[in-house]
Amino acid sequence: MSRRADGRADDELREVRITRGFTTHPAGSVLVEFGQTRVMCTASVTEGVPAWRRDSGLGWLTAEYAMLPAATHTRSGRESVKGRVGGRTQEISRLVGRSLRACIDLAAIGENTIAIDCDVLQADGGTRTAAITGAYVALADAVTWLGAAGALADPQPISCAIAAVSVGVVDGRVRLDLPYEEDSRAEVDMNVVATDTGTLVEIQGTGEGATFPRSTLDKLLDAALAGCEQLFAVQKEALALPYPGVLPEPAEPAKRK
C-alpha cells in the first residue's frame, strides 16, 4: 500500500488526542486534535429552554461552530465583526447539533439547555468531523455534571457514542481522514457521522471533480466506519478517566413553610 505525503497508509487516521477539562468553567470542555487540526469543544448547561420549547418537559441541545481568525494560513476576519454568520458556519453548526441530538434523550434532562461551542484553534482539514468527535466527549461530561446536580430523570440519557471522520478519493485512491493538502484536491470528498451501535447519523458526500460509482461509495463508507470504530475507542479511553472538574452538589428540596 502506498504511503501518503504525511507517511500514513490510505486507511490510517491521523494521531487523535482528546484532552478533557481543557478549560474550567463549562460542564464539559475538551481539546480534540486530529493531527494538526485542533478544536476546543465545550458543553455549557443553562436552566430553561427556548420559548418554543417551554412547558414541554423537554430539554434542548444547540451547537455553534466557529474558526478563530488565525486558524488557517491566511487570517480571516471575525464573523461577529462582519455582522453576519457565513453559510458554511451555519451549516456546520447545525450539523454538530443534529449529530449530538441523535444520541441524547432530551426528555431526561428536563427543561435545561446544553449549548455546544466548537471553536477551531488550528485548521488542517476535517474541522467539522473533529468538532463532532470532541463535542460528544464534552456532552458526556455535561451529562455527568447534570447527574451530579440531580437534574436527570434518567441516569443514562445518552444512548450511544457519536464520532465523525472525513474520507475521500485522492489520486484515485480511497483515503481516510483527509488533511487540507488532500482535501483541497480530492476528486470525491465525504464526511460521515456514525454511532457506536453501527448506524449512520449523516453522510455528506460530493464528487468534486467527477462523478463516482456506487462501488466507490461503498468503499468510502467502509473506510469511514472503520475509522469511526477507532475514534470510539479514543473517546472511551478519554471518558474512562474521572470527571476532570468539580461536580455540583444536588439541589436540596424546598422546605415546607
From Swiss-Prot:
CDD domains found in the cross-reference section: RNase_PH_bact
Enzyme class: transferase
A biological process from GO: tRNA processing
Domain of life: Bacteria
One family name in Pfam for this protein: RNase_PH
Single GO MF descriptor: 3'-5'-RNA exonuclease activity
Name of the protein in question: Ribonuclease PH
Species annotation: Nocardia farcinica (strain IFM 10152)
